[in-house]
C-alpha cells in the first residue's frame, strides 16, 4: 500500500471517528501494513501544517527471539530430547550429536524426564523416566507470539528471557487526532518559489511549506584531524606546560655516527644491521663531522676513558659514515646536548621532540616500520633515578595514564635504564609504552659536559598511547591502508586529563 493511500486512510479514519483519535499500531494492523509505513504517513502529514496532531507514546512488548520462534514451532530442546529417546534408551554419544541435545539434555535431567546410566553396556545410555511430558515452554512461547504475554506469569517470562528465547522491547507509536487545519484532501505544499511560478502567476494558487528556523540544517563538510594528530597536539601541550623546549627534528636522514656512535652504541650491535635499520644507497656516506669530538668518541669506544673500559674493538670511521633513516629521535638529543656542551657556561635545560622514526621491523598488531617517537631530555646537576621516575609519573599522569610499571632494562647509552609499561584495557594486558634511563658518562663526557651534570632521557611511541586512549586494538586500524575513514571523522577531540 502506497504512503499516500495510508495517509488518506488515516485522514478518513479521523473523519469517521469524529473527535476520537487513531492509534498508529491499531491502524497498521487494520490496514495490514508495516507500522513504520503508518509512522511515515503521520510524519508526512505533520509536514503539511496543522492537519493533524500526533502524540508519541511508548509501551512495553514481549517478542520471541529467532531461537524462541524455532522452539515455538518445533518444541523446546528438552522436549525434543525426550521425544528422540526410544523406549530401550539411546547411547549418550549418539544423542549428543543432535544440535538441541546440549541444552535439552541438562534441562530434561532437571525436569526428571530422563536418567543417565553410566554403567550401561556399550557406554553411558539415556532412558526415559516418564511416559509422557507437557512442553510448557512451547505453550508459553506460543501465547507470547499471539500477543497474550500477560497470560504468562512474570516468573516464567523472566525464565524465558534468561534462556534468550524472548526479549522485552519498547514499542513507540503515535496517537493521532485532528489538527486545527484538518482536511481529508491532501494538497502538496511547494518548497521552492520558481521563476516559472512568478512568470505565470501560478504562485498565487500554490501553498508553500513554512520555513523551520529551528532546524540545524546540513552539517558543513570540513576537514577532520587524524587521532594521531590530536594526541600529538596534547603531548606537545603537556611538554610546554612542564617547561620543555621543542627540539628541531627536520633530519629524517642521520649518519650512523649521531644515531649510534655518539650514543655509545657499539658498531657490532645487532640493532645496527640491515635487519633493524634502513640504509641509504645514495648518498650512502656522510662526510661532515666535528672531528675533535669524533676522535673522543672513537677513543672511548676502542680504548675506554672517563672511568670506562670501552668496548675494546677497532672503531671504523666508514661504519660511522653510513647514512640511515634515523631509528630514534635520541640522535636529535645527542646533537642538542653537544651544542649545550659547546656553551661557555652550563645552563640546565629541558628538551622534547615528537617526530617520525624508521625501523626495519615485522609488522604486527603493535609494531610498524614507520612510527612516531616522543623524546624527553632533562639536563641538570645532581639528577638521580628518583628524579627520572618522578618526572615520568607526572608526565604520564598528565596523559591520563595512571597504571604504570617500571622494569629494569639495558640500553647502550643509559645506565640505569627502565622500560615503562601501561595497562591496555582493550588488549587486557600490559603494553610497553616507553624506555628511559640516565645517559651514560661515556656519552656525555666526550661531548664536553661537566662531570657533575646528569641527563635524564625517555622516549615512547605516539601510536600506542593513542591506541590506549581511543580503545584501538590493532595498530593497523590506526595507520595504513586499512584505516577506516569513518573512524577519523567520528573520533572525538582528545583531551588528556591533567
UniProtKB/Swiss-Prot annotation:
Segments passing through the bilayer: none
Give binding positions for Mg(2+).
415
The Gene Ontology CC terms held by the record are:
cytoplasm; cytosol; phenylalanine-tRNA ligase complex
Molecular functions per Gene Ontology: ATP binding; magnesium ion binding; phenylalanine-tRNA ligase activity; tRNA binding
Classification via InterPro entries: aa-tRNA-synth_II, aa-tRNA-synth_II/BPL/LPL, Phe-tRNA-synth_IIc_asu, Phenylalanyl-tRNA_Synthase, PheRS_DBD1, PheRS_DBD2, PheRS_DBD3
Gene name in the database record? farsa-a
The Enzyme Commission number assigned here is: 6.1.1.20
- Protein name in the entry: Phenylalanine--tRNA ligase alpha subunit A
Q: Which cofactor does it need?
A: Mg(2+)
The places in or outside the cell where this protein is found are: Cytoplasm
Alphabetical list of SUPFAM superfamilies matching this protein: Class II aaRS and biotin synthetases
Assembly mode: Heterotetramer; dimer of two heterodimers formed by alpha and beta subunits.
- Binding of L-phenylalanine, residues: 330, 373-375, 413, 439
Which domain of life does this protein belong to?
Eukaryota
Broad enzyme group: ligase
State whether keyword Isomerase applies. Answer: no
Q: Which Pfam families match?
A: PheRS_DBD1, PheRS_DBD2, PheRS_DBD3, tRNA-synt_2d
Gene Ontology biological process terms in this record: phenylalanyl-tRNA aminoacylation; protein heterotetramerization
Amino acid at each position: 500500500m502506497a504512503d499516500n493511500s495510508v495517509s488518506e486512510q488515516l485522514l478518513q479514519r479521523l473523519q469517521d471517528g469524529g473527535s476520537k483519535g487513531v492509534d498508529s499500531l491499531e491502524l497498521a494492523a487494520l490496514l495490514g501494513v508495516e507500522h513504520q509505513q503508518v509512522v511515515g504517513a503521520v510524519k508526512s502529514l505533520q509536514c503539511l501544517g496543522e492537519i493533524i496532531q500526533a502524540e508519541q507514546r511508548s509501551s512495553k512488548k514481549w517478542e520471541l527471539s529467532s531461537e524462541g520462534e524455532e522452539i515455538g514451532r518445533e518444541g523446546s530442546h528438552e522436549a525434543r530430547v525426550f521425544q528422540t529417546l526410544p523406549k530401550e534408551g539411546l547411547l549418550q554419544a549418539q544423542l549428543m550429536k543432535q544440535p538441541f541435545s546440549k541444552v535439552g539434555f541438562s534441562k530434561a535431567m532437571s525436569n526428571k524426564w530422563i536418567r543417565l546410566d553410566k554403567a550401561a553396556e556399550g557406554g553411558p545410555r539415556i532412558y526415559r523416566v516418564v511416559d509422557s511430558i507437557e512442553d510448557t515452554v512451547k505453550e508459553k512461547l506460543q501465547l507470547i507470539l499471539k500477543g497474550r504475554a500477560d497470560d504468562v506469569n512474570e516468573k516464567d517470562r523472566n525464565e524465558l528471557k534468561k534462556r534468550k528465547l524472548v526479549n522485552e522491547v519498547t514499542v513507540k507509536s503515535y496517537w493521532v487526532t485532528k489538527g486545527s487545519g484538518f482536511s481529508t484532501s491532501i494538497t502538496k505544499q511547494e518548497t521552492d518559489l520558481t521563476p516559472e511560478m512568478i512568470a505565470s502567476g501560478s504562485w498565487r494558487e500554490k501553498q508553500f511549506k513554512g520555513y523551520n528556523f529551528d532546524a540545524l540544517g546540513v552539517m558543513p563538510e570540513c576537514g577532520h584531524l587524524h587521532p594521531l594528530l590530536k594526541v600529538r597536539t596534547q603531548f606537545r601541550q603537556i611538554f610546554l606546560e612542564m617547561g620543555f623546549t621543542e627540539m628541531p627534528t627536520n633530519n629524517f636522514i642521520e649518519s650512523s655516527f649521531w644515531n649510534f656512535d655518539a650514543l655509545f652504541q657499539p658498531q657490532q650491535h645487532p640493532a645496527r644491521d640491515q635487519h633493524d635499520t634502513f640504509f641509504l644507497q645514495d648518498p650512502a656516506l656522510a662526510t661532515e663531522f666535528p672531528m675533535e669530538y669524533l676522535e673522543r668518541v672513537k677513543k672511548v669506544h676502542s680504548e675506554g676513558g672517563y672511568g670506562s673500559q670501552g668496548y675494546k674493538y677497532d672503531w671504523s670511521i666508514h661504519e660511522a659514515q653510513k647514512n640511515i633513516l634515523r631509528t630514534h629521535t635520541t640522535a636529535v638529543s645527542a646533537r642538542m646536548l653537544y651544542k649545550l656542551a659547546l656553551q661557555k657556561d652550563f645552563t640546565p635545560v629541558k628538551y622534547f621532540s615528537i617526530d617520525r622514526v624508521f625501523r626495519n621491523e615485522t609488522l604486527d598488531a603493535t609494531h610498524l616500520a614507520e612510527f612516531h617517537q616522543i623524546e624527553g631530555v632533562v639536563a641538570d646537576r645532581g639528577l638521580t633515578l628518583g628524579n627520572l621516575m618522578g618526572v615520568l609519573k607526572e608526565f604520564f599522569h598528565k596523559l591520563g595514564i595512571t597504571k604504570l610499571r617500571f622494569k629494569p632494562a639495558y640500553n647502550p647509552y643509559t645506565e640505569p635504564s627502565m622500560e615503562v609499561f601501561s595497562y591496555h584495557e582493550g588488549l587486557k594486558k600490559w603494553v610497553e609504552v616507553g624506555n628511559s634511563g640516565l645517559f651514560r658518562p661515556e656519552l656525555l663526557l666526550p661531548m664536553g659536559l661537566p662531570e657533575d651534570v646528569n641527563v635524564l632521557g625517555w622516549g615512547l611511541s605516539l601510536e600506542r598511547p593513542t591506541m590506549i586512549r581511543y580503545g584501538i586494538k590493532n595498530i593497523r586500524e590506526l595507520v595504513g591502508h586499512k584505516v577506516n575513514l569513518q573512524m577519523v571523522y567520528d573520533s572525538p577531540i582528545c583531551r588528556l586529563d591533567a
